[in-house]
Regions:
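Signature of Gram-negative outer-membrane beta-barrel scaffolds
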Residues: 97-210
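Outer-membrane beta-barrel domain signature, strongest for Gram-negative TonB-dependent receptors
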Residues: 1-99, 103-111, 127-132, 136-145, ...
Length: 210
């Protein structure tokens, strides 16, 4: 049988989730009589997205590993700006369009783990229970005693640090940033050969840099 209690997860640290998404887009169209009635379209857009995620990473009743909901703790931020210009018009039997597109994006990612108050006694017990007995046997001929009664004190004994101070402020933090820029030039042209036959030619060139 399956013990349902083994399916339980615990959260003794904050599980705050804070996501913000905002953006702005504007489209402007100009009729250009000087170019035979051609139309110029400008589309400008900006977007900003951030997400903070706190969690109890060990999911146990002990305070072992956690993540803070801090901008430089465990977060993702995405910012992008784009600009597109299109010029469209008609010359005789040809409907033509030329355009350009530019985008600038930045992605920031902080990935942090911190150790909790129970990390040291947990790890000490895990390691100490395996090595203390053997260590005591090896040191006994030299009249060096080892406290095997409480494995939770293992790291403080071997390091000489006061109990509970060995991993204060410890953990890991990674920071990643990706920048991307994209430039594109494009055209789309339709030749109305007859009332029943059209020929369309399109071309696009894109250059991405990350």
């Amino acid at each position: 049988t399956i013990d349902a209690s083994q399916r339980l997860g615990y959260a003794n640290r904050s599980t705050e989730q804070d996501t913000k998404d905002k953006g702005l887009s504007a489209e402007v169209n100009w009729q250009m009589d000087a170019l035979g009635g051609a139309s110029l379209t400008s589309i400008t857009a900006y977007r900003d997205w951030t997400s903070l995620n706190a969690m109890d990473a060990d999911f146990s009743g002990a305070d072992l590993i956690f993540r803070d909901a801090d901008p430089k703790g465990h977060s993702t931020a995405f910012e992008t700006f784009s600009q597109e210009l299109r010029l469209t018009g008609t010359s005789g039997r040809v409907d033509w369009m030329i355009g350009a597109f530019w985008a600038d994006e930045t992605l920031d990612r902080y990935d942090q783990y911190q150790v909790g108050a129970h990390y040291e006694p947990y790890l000490s017990t895990l390691v100490g229970s395996q090595v203390l007995a053997g260590l005591a046997a090896q040191l006994a001929p030299m009249n060096i005693s080892v406290n095997t009664a409480n494995p939770a004190l293992f790291f403080s004994q071997v390091s000489g640090r006061p109990y509970g101070t060995g991993f204060i402020g410890g953990g890991s933090q990674d920071y990643y940033q990706q920048k991307a820029r994209s430039l594109a030039l494009f055209t789309n042209n339709t030749w109305h050969a007859t009332d029943q036959f059209d020929l369309t030619l399109g071309l696009r060139y894109t250059h991405d840099r990350k």
